[in-house]
Design a protein with these regions (language model features):
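Solvent-exposed, non-transmembrane regions of membrane-associated and secreted proteins
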Residues: 4-121, 125-210
Length: 210
């Protein structure tokens, strides 16, 4: 599934990506009713949860996350600039495959959770706290990511790069998106931050040193 982004900038600074139809939910296999095997319990606790908070220590950000969808193919962040939106039809943070997309408004006068997103640097830490879904067992999770790339794209460039930036076919990663380049009436660009699981980053560094 490819997420195509159409930048409809407004004074509030919210990116509004146009999204495809939701993907089919993945199927799971469970044991017989009333039987909870160790393997089943381990699998349940290992599944990614639903994100409810983003923490970015370098930006002093600790913001709630709400699931958002795109019934009209337009993904709009929550109206409150201190609240972020997670594209619920894409990957969950912690999933092995796919880009988990989190978006938020930028406020040119200040007050948006992602106002300073473009100042992140490679290697900065990003944490996503998740909860279990209704009827799911297992502890709450915290996914640790490391910033890999920070880019600013104009509208046309972002549209051309969307298939790669928001791909659901890549190894699991986190993508943060907000607006940038306020010209007095609207935002002209988007900031896109790509972060990879911290464990993956540690493995790659160990291989490079080896």
């Amino acid at each position: 599934v490819v997420l195509t982004v159409v930048l409809l900038t407004r004074g509030e600074g919210g990116p509004t990506p146009a999204a495809p139809a939701p993907t089919s939910p993945s199927s799971t296999t469970t044991g017989p009713p009333g039987v909870d095997t160790t393997e089943d319990a381990t699998y349940a606790s290992a599944r990614p949860g639903y994100p409810d908070r983003l923490v970015v220590p370098a930006l002093d950000v600790d913001a709630p996350i709400r699931p958002i969808r795109a019934p009209d193919r337009t993904l709009v962040p929550p109206a409150d600039p201190q609240v972020l939106g997670w594209w619920a039809d894409g990957a969950r943070p912690g999933a092995d495959t796919g880009s988990a997309l989190v978006v938020g408004h930028t406020v040119h006068t200040g007050g948006g959770a992602l106002d300073d997103l473009e100042t992140l640097a490679e290697g900065d830490e990003v944490l996503v706290h998740s909860h279990r879904g209704s009827g799911e067992e297992g502890p709450e999770r915290t996914e640790s990511y490391v910033v890999q790339d920070v880019e600013v794209y104009r509208k046309g460039t972002l549209a051309r790069r969307a298939a790669d930036l928001f791909s659901q076919e890549v190894d699991g990663r986190l993508v943060l998106l907000t607006c940038e380049d306020w010209d007095g009436t609207r935002y002209l660009s988007n900031v896109v931050v790509t972060a990879v699981p911290a464990a993956d980053e540690d493995d790659s560094e160990g291989t490079a040193r080896g």
